[in-house]
Amino acid sequence: YQVGENIEVTIPGSSQGKALVSVETGSQVVDNFLIQTNKGNTSFSFKATADMAPNVYLNITLIQPHAQTVNDLPIRMYGIVPLKVYDPGTVLSPQLDMAGELAPGKEVSIKVSEKEGKAMAYTLAIVDEGLLDITNFETPDPWNHFYKREAIGV
């Protein structure tokens, strides 16, 4: 899902039950809903927000009416579903304005900017390409590192 999109959730349940749906990140409860369930499937939706990126977990607790005899399911059932949420506002596109080649001992001028003008912090490292080739080093994608899936922690 992308920030701003509707997230549609379908919960199987019994009539006259309740579902407590908690939207959780790795460190906090972002939102929660108490839903009246219908026989069969119950659907509801909510909007994906920026604080749900890079992922959230839907922690669903389904509670049936006490002393019901319609089915033999437990009174309480639990389930957790992970959801990925993409926030395009977190993607940075740094640009370098510099000479095509650098020579040892020579002065160099490098201008660093972000394509969309977003604020960013950066570290600049100048490394010999031959050294990187010897070690088969592949330059990592920082966004994939900092916005990888978080473990549930609530």
Task: Give the positions of each predicted feature.
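Short beta-strand segments of immunoglobulin-like
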Residues: 1-2, 96-102
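Beta-strand-rich binding/interaction modules
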Residues: 6-27, 55-62, 105-127
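Short strand-edge motifs at loop-to-beta-strand transitions and within beta-strands
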Residues: 7, 40-46
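Short acidic loop-to-helix transition motifs that present clustered carboxylates
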Residues: 26-30, 39-42, 90
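Acidic glycine/proline-rich low-complexity segments
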Residues: 28-33, 51-84, 117-154
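Outer-membrane beta-barrel proteins
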Residues: 34, 46-48, 71, 98-100
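Short gly/acidic/polar-rich coil/turn motifs that serve as flexible hinges in modular proteins
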Residues: 38-40, 49-52, 101, 105
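Proline-enriched interdomain boundary motifs that mark the N-terminal boundary
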Residues: 90-96
